[in-house]
Amino acid sequence: MRLNGETKTLKDTVALSDFLTQEGFSDKRIAVERNGEIVPKGEYANVILSDSDTLEIVAFVGGGW
């Protein structure tokens, strides 16, 4: 699979929610795109990843004046 442009190998079948935890992402302040489509936060546990998937994960950070 590809994660933010880098190749990753999935060792087992894994749900998106578990993958995010394993990779150190907090699901509270991120957006996930899977194969060109945004995944709603409520679906993270239902989405099973495969080696052919492409994920783009964007983390939101606070800041400003």
Predicted regions and their residues:
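Ubiquitin-like/PB1-type beta-grasp interaction modules and other compact soluble beta-rich domains
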Residues: 1-65
